[in-house]
Every structure is written in C-alpha cells, then in structure tokens.
C-alpha cells in the first residue's frame, strides 16, 4: 500500500465524511487546549514578533481545521493585548498528504476571513493561509521559519506499512488480522515498533530545522499507557474491524488472501517510546508529556445498556472509523459502496455489543516541546 497516495480522510460534507464524523478528534483538541494555550502564551511573552509562522500538520479538512488555527490566533491576540505588544502578522500553513481535501478548506476561506475581520479585527493583509501538501515525515518549510507547530490525531499514522508484513509465505505473518493483536507473533510487534522508531525521529528532526530557537510544538496522538503494544486501548478497534471483515470473508464477499495482506499503517506508542526518541534526537526540551482517555464515540452516548444506546454508540463509532480508514479499505480490497456499507453496519453491531459490556476507551498522548537554543 502506498500510504502517501492512498491515505486520506473521507472528503466533502456527506453522511460518511470526516467533516461530519470527527467528534473524537474535536474532543481531543478541546481537552488539549490548555497545553496549547500555555505554549502559545510563552512564545508571545518571550518574543515581540512582526510575523509569526504557525503550522498545523495533518490538518485534514472539515470544521476542526480552521477551528484550530482560529483558536491559536485568539490566544496570540489576547496575550499580545495584555502585554501591550502589537499583534503579529500570521503566516498559517495547513499541511496534509497530497490526496487531502484541500479544496473544501479553500472554499471555506472567504467566510473564515470575513469572520476574522468582523470578530477579531484581523484583515486579509495580516493573515496569510497556505496549503502545504506532503508528508510531515520530512522537510516541509524553510529553515527557522516557524514559531509554533501543531499536530493533532495524525502522528499515529505511519509513513508506510512496516516492511516484511506483506509476506508471500504459505502462512501469512498476521493471518486474519489487520493490525497488532493478542495473537500476533512477536515479529509483527517488532516490525511496527521499528517503523515507529524510523518515522518519529524523522518528524522530530525535520521540525528541529524548521522551528526557530525557543519555538514550540504541541503534538497529540493515539497512544497507550502500557509498554505492551497488544493492550485493548490501542488495538481493539482494529480487532473488531478484523472480525467484521472476516464475517464478509466467510460469506465469499471478500477474499481471505486480501485480508491476510492488509496491515494498517498505524501505531499507538507508549509515553516512554516517545520520550526515548525525542531525547535521542536531542533538539527539544520536553515540557509536558501527558495522557487522557476518550470514548470511542467522543462521549456522545451516555447509556449504552439499552438497545437504543447500544445501537447509537455502535453507529457513531463505526462512522468515526469509516471516515478515517475507508480510503485504505477501498484501495486494498477494491469493494464497492454496497459491501462497504455492509462492512460498517456489521462493525457497528459488533462495537455496540462490545461497548455495552466493556467501555473500552482510546488513550491519547499530548506532548509539549520547546526547541533548544
């Protein structure tokens, strides 16, 4: 799978779009807001800037995209006013992979600029927004051009499927699974860990060149508390997806060989793994490294023990995952809309049954970093 060409959130504003099904990601941004505010405040306190470079890496599309940069601008403006500093010009860079729905973002900019002018008094001559297509596992910006980097719900995606997993052997390495599971052999766990150890330092090293001395970076991604990569909080959504896919295999709707050759380019690290890679690279001070839980549906359904509650939470969790992974499933399995609908209907039922018994939650890590001088 060519991840950089295939991976994108569902486009547009339809029923299955990311724009309509990104409540979990929005909640993650909201919970992490105090940490973002702290970082932005320190930049504004320590510098009187004429122009401020801000990048959102893995911006996707939909309401979360412009909401994030709007809130960062609010923070800078409020701190500047308190200190009696002039509000800097804003250079805002929205980055994602080439197949991201940048058109939707650009179409929403006129209304966004209008709100900036009406609500904040910031005109188009003081705010410059650019789309930057490319992988953040490499350089994206000129040296020392950024003051703040934000990335939320993106760094758990790997640059590629770990090498060696797509085996042509008689018995596939991760048979019947789409990610790490309790039954995965150690070689699968090791391959995913190695890919993270390759990708994450490339991200950190690239940002170290692009950020000014004292620049700040706040990263948020799915992770896990335990050092064990097979824990439910990091794996079970994929385990249940594999169950739904295998039910289609048993009915002859999907080829089993296709399942055995599909491996999700995702990795949920523990805090220690992140800490080790940051310290090894050496360009950043870790100011904060924290974690928190979040419901699979973003906490929208409170009572999951009734038939209606079980149905609703399953449907919401299924729509949230579909908005994120449909592009990869469509590319790999080559299935049409009817089978895709069937797959996520089955997944919704499986998830509803599971969450009515055990309220498994995602675990999210937030890291706040300062570029060393």
Swiss-Prot record:
- Identify the enzyme class: transferase
Q: In which pathway does it act?
A: Lipid metabolism; oxylipin biosynthesis
Q: Where in the cell is it found?
A: Cytoplasm; Nucleus
The UniProt keywords, alphabetically, are:
Cytoplasm, Magnesium, Metal-binding, Methyltransferase, Nucleus, Transferase
Q: Where does jasmonate bind?
A: 25, 156-157
- Cellular component, GO, one term: cytoplasm
Which cofactors does this gene product need? Mg(2+)
**What is an example of a GO molecular function annotated in this UniProt entry?**
S-adenosylmethionine-dependent methyltransferase activity
Q: Which family does it belong to?
A: Belongs to the methyltransferase superfamily. Type-7 methyltransferase family.
Question: What role is this protein assigned?
Answer: Catalyzes the methylation of jasmonate into methyljasmonate, a plant volatile that acts as an important cellular regulator mediating diverse developmental processes and defense responses.
Q: What is this protein called?
A: Probable jasmonic acid carboxyl methyltransferase 1
Classification of source organism: Eukaryota, Viridiplantae, Streptophyta, Embryophyta, Tracheophyta
